[in-house]
């Protein structure tokens, strides 16, 4: 099951050329970029691991691409994404996020249903990948 989080998530994987164009856009708008990775793909896992330091005041997209390549090389079977942060007063938020690397096999999620009093149903998601210990999931 393909993980769909962030911008472009329903499109085919971006090529390096397409990623470079998005990074050039991020730099041209004066946004700060950072690279993050995880092996826990749960949709509510918003705390991915930060790769290096955030790239503030970067004037060249190749610096961000270098960090992406380094992360891909060190974590080839992890999800890797780029975030663009706008520090403009009143916004001060992540304005763009997209996945740039995925594991070769994405096992998907288990939907668990529980019955509660009053015929109430509660649902939860469980990633099949998290059945293995952290660092050995893919």
From Swiss-Prot:
Where, per UniProt, does this protein localize? Answer: Plastid, Chloroplast
Give the GO terms filed under biological process for this record. reductive pentose-phosphate cycle
Range of residues in the leader sequence: none
Q: Which Gene3D superfamilies match?
A: Ribulose bisphosphate carboxylase, small subunit
**How is this protein named in the record?**
Ribulose bisphosphate carboxylase small subunit
InterPro entries attached to this UniProt entry:
RuBisCO_ssu (IPR024681), RuBisCO_ssu_dom (IPR000894), RuBisCO_ssu_sf (IPR036385)
Its main subcellular localisation, reduced to a broad class, is: plastid
> Is DNA-binding found in the keyword set?
no
State the CDD domains in the record. RuBisCO_small (cd03527)
Q: What molecular functions are annotated in GO for this chain?
A: ribulose-bisphosphate carboxylase activity
Q: What does this protein do?
A: RuBisCO catalyzes two reactions: the carboxylation of D-ribulose 1,5-bisphosphate, the primary event in carbon dioxide fixation, as well as the oxidative fragmentation of the pentose substrate in the photorespiration process. Both reactions occur simultaneously and in competition at the same active site. Although the small subunit is not catalytic it is essential for maximal activity.
| UniProtKB keywords | Calvin cycle, Carbon dioxide fixation, Chloroplast, Photorespiration, Photosynthesis, Plastid
What else the UniProt entry mentions is: In this alga, in contrast to plants, the small subunit is encoded in the chloroplast.
- Gene Ontology CC terms: chloroplast
Record's subunit section: Heterohexadecamer of 8 large and 8 small subunits.
Give the protein family: Belongs to the RuBisCO small chain family.
């Amino acid at each position: 099951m393909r993980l769909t989080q962030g911008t472009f998530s329903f499109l085919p994987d971006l090529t390096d050329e397409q990623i470079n164009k998005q990074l050039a856009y991020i730099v041209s708008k004066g946004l700060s970029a950072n690279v993050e990775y995880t092996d826990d793909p749960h949709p509510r896992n918003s705390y991915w691991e930060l790769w290096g330091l955030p790239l503030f005041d970067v004037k060249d997209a190749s610096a961000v691409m270098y960090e992406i390549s380094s992360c891909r090389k060190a974590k080839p079977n992890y999800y890797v994404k780029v975030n663009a942060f706008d520090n403009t007063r009143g916004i001060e938020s992540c304005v763009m996020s997209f996945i740039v690397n995925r594991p070769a096999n994405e096992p998907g999620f288990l939907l668990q249903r529980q019955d509660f009093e009053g015929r109430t149903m509660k649902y939860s998601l469980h990633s099949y990948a998290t059945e293995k210990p952290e660092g050995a999931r893919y």
